[in-house]
Structures are given as structure tokens and as C-alpha cells.
């Protein structure tokens, strides 16, 4: 398990590896697909961080989550997998092409039905949310 680019100590890295779940074929494919994008691939949430997000979402029993900055959907897949069975995730992605890539990856991962992707500036999407909308988990990427 890498501790780059965000340094974490070995004890935390071991804990995440042991408790947060591994990387299946879909996640490995998204990692490869994103790496092929060149220098912008650094925008992908690191696998260890994404696994930790999934664990946090699962442990909190979150029903409704938000992600600002979806990129290729890697973090969104992990967040959606951690949600309660009838939970939902709303993702905000500025770039329409990246949103389409994320949608395909979410669908392939089997969590597409839980995820809405809003294309455009996140501030506009957030302002459009109903006032009474409760959010249990938010990830600003």
C-alpha cells in the first residue's frame, strides 16, 4: 500500500488495508484508465483514501452523500459502495466529458442507480438542492 501522495503512517495504512476492503477489477480498471490520462491523473482520489472514505460512509450508516469533484468516478464508486442499501450520492462535476466517464465507471461498478451526476459548477448545484435536504456525508475532492 502506498503512502503517497498524502503521507499517512504505516499503522493507519495497515488498518485501512485490513478493514476497508480491497480493489476489485473495476477499481483497477478505473485506476489504469485514469493513469492513461497523463498529468491530470493526480486528480484521482488515492486508492487508500477512497477505501477509507468507503469505510467512513459505511460506519456512519450514511443515507445521503455529496461529492464535489467526481473526475473519473473512483471516489464516487467507493462512497456509493459504502452507502446504506437505499442510500444516494449526488456528484458535482464541472466537465461533461469527465462526468460521462464517471457515469460509465459507476454503472460498470454496479452502483450507478445510487448516483446522480450534476454537470456544471458545484456552487450552482448546491444552491439548487432543496433547503430541507439532509446530507450525512460530504466529500470535497
Predicted features and spans:
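Switch II (G3) loop of P-loop NTPases
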Residues: 141
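A short alpha-helical cap/connector motif
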Residues: 1-137
Amino acid at each position: 500500500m502506498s503512502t503517497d501522495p498524502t503521507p499517512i503512517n504505516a499503522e493507519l495504512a495497515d488498518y485501512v488495508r485490513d478493514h476497508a476492503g480491497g480493489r476489485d477489477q473495476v477499481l483497477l480498471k478505473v485506476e489504469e484508465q485514469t493513469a492513461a490520462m497523463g498529468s491530470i491523473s493526480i486528480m484521482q482520489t488515492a486508492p487508500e483514501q477512497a477505501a477509507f472514505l468507503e469505510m467512513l460512509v459505511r460506519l456512519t450508516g450514511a443515507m445521503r452523500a455529496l461529492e464535489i469533484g467526481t473526475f473519473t468516478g473512483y471516489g464516487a464508486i467507493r462512497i456509493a459502495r459504502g452507502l446504506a442499501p437505499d442510500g444516494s450520492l449526488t456528484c458535482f462535476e464541472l466537465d461533461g466529458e469527465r462526468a460521462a466517464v464517471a457515469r460509465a465507471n459507476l454503472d460498470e461498478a454496479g452502483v450507478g442507480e445510487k448516483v446522480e451526476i450534476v454537470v456544471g459548477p458545484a456552487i450552482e448545484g448546491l444552491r439548487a438542492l432543496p433547503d430541507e435536504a439532509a446530507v450525512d456525508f460530504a466529500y470535497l475532492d
